[in-house]
Amino acid sequence: MTDLRRNRYSISAGVGKSVLDSLGKFYGSPKRQLPNKFEAGKEYTGYNAPWIPFALDWLKQGKYSSEWIAMGSLNEEPNNMIQLLKLITGDDGNSHLEKAQAATDLEYPVTKLLWNPSSVGSNTDSQLLASTDQQLRLWKTDFEAGIDSPLLCQASLSTHVKTHNNAPLTSFDWCKTDPSYIVVSSLDTTCTVWDIVAQQSKTQLIAHDKEVYDVAFLKDSINVFVSVGADGSVRMFDLRSLDHSTIIYEGDSTFWKRNGDYTNASPPVSAPLLRLSACDSDVNLMATFHHNSSDVQMIDIRVPGTAYATLRGHKGDVNAVKWMPGSKSKLATCGDDCVVSLWDLDQPVNPSPAPTLSVSGTTPGMTGSTSEYVTPVSSVNSMRETASPLNADNQYSPLLSWKLEHEVNNLSWSVKNDGLAVVYGKSLEILKVPQ
């Protein structure tokens, strides 16, 4: 898709061939039949949805007797949904996902979901869930009431009185230092900070020259956040000084000339940056990736202007990157190559080519045999994966990887960091991460 504004929702999804053109392709192509991977009556650690899932978040609070996952749909029709799933572990140690009654219908695709961070001194059994589509919405459910508890909308926040005038919201982040604040990014080039207790916007600013695709608060801060957008830059803002922003990173400026857009733009801009993940253990570190790119850029705000490292391992476009909570060295990525990869920045790379690894079918969610260097793989079908030699300028290779059946659109870490929830096709699956 050469015209970024051709479809206003084509930038709000981030699946398949990236945030920019996936929905445009989805609308213009015949509907593809996606198989039901998890058969009825079999307890796999997975779930078949009647729609294509994208938005995803695993509840990070361990105070509940069960674990919960929220996921949202990406439907072309004005019929979208948020569904809660309960992860149940039996006495034999095997787990399966159970559909809860907590679900709700929405008109527009859900671009992001996040459970509220832990609040100091909070002892309530109710939990807040935030979502974005045309509005920032807050939902509430009572986990102690079990899977029959409904998902109730507590607020729908918008800077416009008329909802149909809203530009789609692409992403948001919950402030972990003060959960009463949420920052939201939009296609209209703005970021808005909301006080969800007062249900009022604290400030709205023009964050980028073009559409904003993702936003994140920095560790331990209620004032500083970073954003990425179609202008190809990572920008940092301080709510105490909004008269300027700091450009932390800008990529290659030849993108638009290669793709036939904005050839007369001055100055030239780089390939759009689609998603951003800020490390919650080191305020200086974050990860991002470009449109139509299989690489992940590692950013250190103490060294602005360039990526301090590039993660190269995917064979297709990257769709998501997430730091492991509580870690400043481990993160997970997924992409159009149907692969989920775990990276450890503290692990040295062996300079010899990674070995060829054959893996036969395994139980969904379980890892296959491991290699000292790279890529144990999980698959329902037998497969062979041949790893290529590392590029000379690549400092890292995946610690391990899983090969799935379709493009992997999103992922989320478990509360104990021992699992990854991933969505692909019409399925959600839990991958067990070796400790």
UniProtKB/Swiss-Prot annotation:
Q: Disordered: where is this region? A: 352-371
Compartments (UniProt record): Cytoplasm; Golgi apparatus
Any keyword Phosphoprotein? yes
- State the WD repeat positions: 105-149, 164-204, 207-247, 313-353
List, alphabetically, the Pfam families matched. WD40
Task: Answer yes or no on keyword Oxidoreductase.
Answer: no
SUPFAM superfamilies in the record: WD40 repeat-like
Give residues where Phosphoserine occurs.
S266, S388
Q: Main localisation, per the record?
A: cytoplasm
Could you list this entry's UniProt keywords, alphabetically sorted.
Cytoplasm, Golgi apparatus, Phosphoprotein, Repeat, WD repeat
Q: Record's GO cellular component, any one?
A: Golgi apparatus
Signal peptide positions on this chain? none
Residue spans of biased composition, Low complexity class: 358-371
Q: What is this protein called?
A: Uncharacterized WD repeat-containing protein C17D11.08
Q: Which organism is it from?
A: Schizosaccharomyces pombe (strain 972 / ATCC 24843)
